[in-house]
From Swiss-Prot:
Protein's name according to its UniProt entry: 23S rRNA (uracil(747)-C(5))-methyltransferase RlmC
Annotated organism of origin: Shewanella oneidensis (strain ATCC 700550 / JCM 31522 / CIP 106686 / LMG 19005 / NCIMB 14063 / MR-1)
Recorded family membership: Belongs to the class I-like SAM-binding methyltransferase superfamily. RNA M5U methyltransferase family. RlmC subfamily.
Record: residues binding [4Fe-4S] cluster: C7, C15, C18, C94
Reactions the enzyme catalyzes: uridine(747) in 23S rRNA + S-adenosyl-L-methionine = 5-methyluridine(747) in 23S rRNA + S-adenosyl-L-homocysteine + H(+)
PROSITE patterns according to UniProt: SAM_MT_RNA_M5U, TRMA_1, TRMA_2
Length: 386
């Protein structure tokens, strides 16, 4: 891992997404560690709380997903962003992407040109192609390619050029069109139209098969994410739980790492596509004592499910955290332990105020987002025996 990444886009002021890229990784990690320790200091009530060393990965070439705004014109498309001064900037060779992904992004610029699809102009409410979303699986280097269109009008042009693209890049496994008709900078709409027989991308973290569908959330740094899931498995394994809940479970990464044929698992996630992926993974793993349901996690916990209290609960909420209502429900369930995976330590700290009767015993930072302010935190809460 190098100590400093050189980015021309940042130097020229064209892209400021990696706001800390001029700092060596050691300094970036020190700042994140200090922030985490300060936020969680009020919850360290004894010397039993361990702050473990941060887990890091590569500082470039680590990202598995590109979200490209389509700019320019049909004869000269640009995949990237609008710079602070209003310039269309191609980010096909962004250093966060692996080399093969960069090459494919450049090829997709040519694809748009060959198809003659006009980029959407939000200021004029004209054009067709809004975004290109590209996701890479590390298993076989396969890709899921999504075109976000204003309407179905340009689908025929995509279908016309697609055979040549897929012959050149046979690792493109899934292709779809998302229809987003609203004249706003919204990433995707409700309608998804598949142009390939395959509708999901296979990934594997450690020994767990996982699946990615167009609208299911998936970690963007697979190397560090695999370590995150493995650490969760080890921490949970120390409790030998008799039953598990995985709330905000997504495609099932945490729960499937921690479940076994002897440990029943209930996974809850509001996104139906993610639940479909989790069910496929459980089937591949031969787990028949697992159930995944497309429900709101808070509604589930406060409903009839309260009658079947789990031995250990995993929560992996979005940036807003789990909220006071779910914190109250977890406190009432009083499981032996709660494993909280957070992508926002500020909301983690807010939630810890409302989770009553638990000690924070172990914390570890996972740097899934180098050069940014963001990071993931794994926190173990153990029922207070006092």
């Amino acid at each position: 891992m190098s100590t400093l990444v050189q980015c021309g886009y940042f130097e020229r002021g064209q892209c400021q997404s990696c706001r800390h890229i001029k700092l060596p990784m050691v300094q970036q990690l020190a700042a994140k560690t200090q922030e985490l320790q300060q936020l969680l200091a009020p919850f360290v009530v004894s010397t039993n709380t361990q702050f473990l060393p941060p887990v890091v990965g590569e500082d470039s070439g680590f990202r598995n997903k590109a979200k490209m705004v389509v700019l320019g014109a049909a004869h000269a498309p640009v995949l990237g962003i609008v710079s602070p001064n209003g310039e269309a900037v191609s980010l096909c060779d962004c250093l966060l992407y692996p080399a093969d992904m960069q090459a494919l992004l450049y090829r997709l610029e040519r694809f748009v040109q060959q198809a003659g699809i006009p980029p959407y102009r939000i200021d004029k409410a004209k054009g067709e192609l809004k975004y290109i979303l590209l996701t890479r699986s590390q298993v076989r280097g396969e890709y899921m390619l999504r075109f976000v269109l204003r309407s179905p009008d340009a689908i025929a042009r995509i279908e016309r050029e697609l055979p040549a693209l897929m012959a050149e890049y046979p690792q493109i496994n899934v292709v779809s069109v998302n229809i987003q008709p609203i004249h706003m900078a919204i990433l995707e709409g409700d309608e998804e139209i598949f142009l390939t027989e395959n509708t999901r991308l296979e990934e594997r973290f450690n020994d767990v098969p996982l699946f990615i569908r167009p609208k299911s959330f998936f970690q963007t740094n697979p190397h560090v994410a695999a370590k995150l899931y493995q650490t969760a498995r080890e921490w949970v394994g120390e409790f030998a739980p008799k039953s598990l809940w995985d709330l905000f479970c997504g495609v099932g990464g945490f729960g499937l790492h921690c479940a076994s044929k002897d440990i029943p698992l209930t996974g809850i996630e509001i996104e139906a596509e993610a639940i479909a992926c989790a069910k496929m993974s459980a089937q591949m793993m031969g787990l028949d004592n697992v159930q995944f349901m497309a429900l709101d996690s808070t509604d589930f916990a406060k409903g009839d499910a309260a009658a079947t209290k789990p031995d250990l609960i995993i929560v992996n909420p979005p940036r807003r955290g789990i909220g006071e209502s779910l914190c109250d429900a977890l406190s009432e369930f009083a499981p032996r332990a709660i494993l909280y995976s957070s992508c926002n330590p500020k909301t983690l700290a807010k939630d810890l105020v409302h989770i009553r009767g638990y000690q924070l015993t172990r914390v570890q930072l996972f740097d899934l987002f180098p050069h940014s302010d963001h990071f993931e935190v794994l926190a173990m809460l153990v029922k207070d025996s006092r």
